[in-house]
């Protein structure tokens, strides 16, 4: 308990946004990783922001964080707010009008981003917050929980894009990855944004995002 309280005091994050699949995947390691991440957030005194609902890895993370006594914010487009589609959401529900507002609200509420294994939606959310960091819209850390090497192919692709001149070496450093929740959180806690922003001279109107 003493160690847990110390971790809570030391964490730089109040809320972390977790992107993950609405499926649980085919391996138990994905489900275990989702619960481990939730426990790590609870141990560090960090609240959760996610896409809402109780299905897939999203449901596992949110339920474990909620059961651990932390606040959970589920951001859901009104069209999807039916039990048949997303199940029941624990904690606080914040309805939004569409998918674009969902991502903006999730980003506004969060101090960091983590992607668990997931599909198209997870990748789209992940790549958008990486792009926002590259453009200087935010300076929040972005982490990949690379469970069983799930994201190895994506990281290889990004490294190839660096080699081919489409992503700068400094922008490659935006992405923080680790195979376990504890290691990833340690890296995110230490993260300092030192990449060269692509559009550093621009004055983004980001008040609606809270950046």
From Swiss-Prot:
Disulfide bonds: none annotated. It catalyses: N(6)-(dimethylallyl)adenosine 5'-phosphate + H2O = N(6)-dimethylallyladenine + D-ribose 5-phosphate; 9-ribosyl-trans-zeatin 5'-phosphate + H2O = trans-zeatin + D-ribose 5-phosphate. One of its GO terms (cellular component) is cytosol. Signal peptide: none annotated. Its EC number is 3.2.2.n1. Coiled coil: none annotated. Substrate binds at residues 84, 102-103, 119-125, 131. Keywords: Cytokinin biosynthesis, Hydrolase. Belongs to the LOG family. This is Probable cytokinin riboside 5'-monophosphate phosphoribohydrolase LOGL3.
């Amino acid at each position: 308990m003493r160690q847990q309280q110390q971790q809570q005091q030391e964490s730089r994050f109040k809320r972390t946004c977790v992107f993950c699949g609405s499926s649980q995947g085919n391996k138990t390691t994905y489900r275990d990783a989702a619960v481990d991440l939730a426990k790590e957030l609870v141990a560090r005194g960090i609240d959760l922001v996610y896409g809402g609902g109780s299905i897939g890895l999203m449901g596992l993370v949110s339920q474990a964080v909620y059961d651990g006594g932390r606040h959970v914010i589920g951001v859901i487009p009104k069209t999807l707010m039916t039990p048949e589609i997303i199940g029941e959401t624990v904690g606080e529900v914040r309805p939004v009008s569409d998918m674009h507002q969902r991502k903006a609200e999730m980003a506004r509420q969060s101090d960091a981003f983590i992607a668990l294994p997931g599909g198209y939606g997870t990748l789209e959310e992940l790549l958008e917050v990486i792009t926002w960091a590259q453009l200087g819209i935010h300076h929040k850390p972005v982490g990949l929980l690379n469970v069983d090497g799930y994201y190895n192919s994506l990281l290889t692709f990004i490294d190839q894009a660096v080699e081919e001149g489409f992503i700068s070496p400094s922008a490659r450093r935006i992405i923080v990855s680790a195979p376990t929740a504890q290691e990833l959180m340690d890296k995110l806690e230490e993260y300092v944004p030192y990449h060269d922003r692509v559009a550093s001279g621009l004055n983004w109107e980001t008040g609606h995002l809270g950046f």
